[in-house]
């Protein structure tokens, strides 16, 4: 906790932007709630503005990063307890949120929900989130509209020596489940 707190202090002293820390609920055998809460309190006292808590522990001895995203069990209850003990802190939860409904339900217990891979893998599934969470009545764009709107950006990237694939590879999932998706890919 002391090293991380020192980093947070340095960041806070060198910029005016909010500082967020993303962390797991534990590492290897160091996964007691007491240690987690102590870590968060220590870092909060150093000035962290927001905590994004991944609801899994990290197993550094024996699991690779990909395995660490699926094998350690999600423990939402641990993050919920952390928030209850620290209501003054901005705490958002991360890990395993793959639907808008599941995310909205979590907002009842946390200050936010971080959505990661699900948005990248299934972006159109998330196109109604602003409407469902904030009541903003926006019409979701079609994948083709999004892709065509990026052409000037891709052209600029290419004029600076980049390859179109640098950007296009991240658009493949936009066409998931639509007719003739293979043509777009």
What are the roles of these predicted feature ranges?
Residues 1, 55-69:
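Glycine-rich, proline-tolerant flexible connector loops at the mouths of alpha/beta enzymes
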């Amino acid at each position: 906790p002391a090293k991380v707190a020192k980093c947070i202090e340095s960041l806070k002293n060198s910029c005016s932007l909010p500082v967020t820390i993303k962390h797991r609920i534990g590492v290897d055998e160091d996964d007691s709630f007491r240690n987690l809460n102590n870590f968060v309190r220590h870092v909060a006292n150093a000035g962290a503005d927001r905590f994004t808590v991944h609801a899994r522990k990290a197993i550094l001895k024996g699991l690779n990063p990909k395995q660490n995203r699926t094998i350690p069990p999600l423990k939402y209850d641990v993050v919920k307890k952390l928030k209850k003990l620290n209501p003054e802190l901005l705490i958002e939860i991360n890990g395993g949120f793959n639907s808008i409904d599941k995310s909205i339900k979590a907002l009842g217990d946390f200050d936010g929900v971080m959505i990661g891979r699900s948005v990248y893998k299934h972006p159109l599934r998330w196109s109604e989130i602003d409407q469902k969470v904030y009541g903003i009545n926006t019409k979701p764009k079609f994948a083709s509209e999004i892709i065509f709107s990026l052409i000037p950006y891709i052209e600029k990237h290419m004029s600076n020596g980049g390859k179109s694939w640098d950007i296009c590879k991240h658009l493949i999932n936009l066409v998931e489940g639509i007719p003739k998706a293979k043509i777009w890919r």
